Amino acid sequence: MILLCRQYRKQLSELMSTRHLPVLLDESVQGLRAERGGVFVDATLGGGGHAEKILEAHPDNIVIGIDRDAQAIARTQKRLEAYGDRAIYVHAPFSSIESVVEQHANGKVDGILADLGVSSDQIEDRDRGFSFMQDGPLDMRMDATRQKASAASLLAEASEDEIESWLSTYGEERFARKIAHAIVKQRRFGQLLRTTQLADLVERTVSRGMGGHHPATRTFQAIRIAVNRELDEVSMLLECAPRLLVDGGRLAVISFHSLEDRLVKNSFRNEARSSDFVNVYKKGIVPCSDEVRSNTRSRSARLRVLSKETT
């Protein structure tokens, strides 16, 4: 871990040219054993930091990058241009991984990586509507070209019980009922269309208290998960990804909150009960102190790795 922290300090200066810093970069690429060479899937291509590290790990490595965000793919194509046809780009949700691997790798790959977090590029783009910290349209769609329902339309049409369920389940929000009631009551005065409208409504409904997170943090997380059906996507990925691995292949997943991590932990535990799979890190790996200080987004990250071992 000390060595990885030193490596992280070196990487930080190299990565500061982009807003988004990949989390657990060395740990995840080492977990995939990418230095052995092979075909890998980055199921959440994002800014391309993990994909680039995999491509650097071996001169013959090929990365199939999947992302439902067309803007992210366009940016990353420029970043990885030097790698030519070793980098393949697919605009799709990662629940489509089985058909993607069938099309581009004859059904089997040496490793799969999924970083389940929202990228800094998405959060900092006010027009995407992910953040309560700046005013923007209440959108939150990962793929506005293919997804019809934005956060604004979802909140305008859902029942109070549905909204409460999202807040309670996806945001683990203890004031879910109170906030849901306030959202529905607001409809009498007009639709919530802006991020600051929703954030202000939650703040008026729930006392900020002393320090800690903004009171709208859990609400925004919950609505984002609902809009993008994120946990359904994760469940579908975890169901099909293990069978896409060659013998010795690995699946590495980085989660950022307890709901995701619980899904990953339970899935890996169930797979490991079979003689075909090994849960490589029983408790997972968390970022070193240097990474957390330099990139606060990483503080809740946890990496879990599953290995296919049929010999």
Q: For each predicted feature, which ranges?
A:
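S-adenosyl-L-methionine-dependent methyltransferase catalytic core, i.e., the SAM/SAH-binding region
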Residues: 2-311
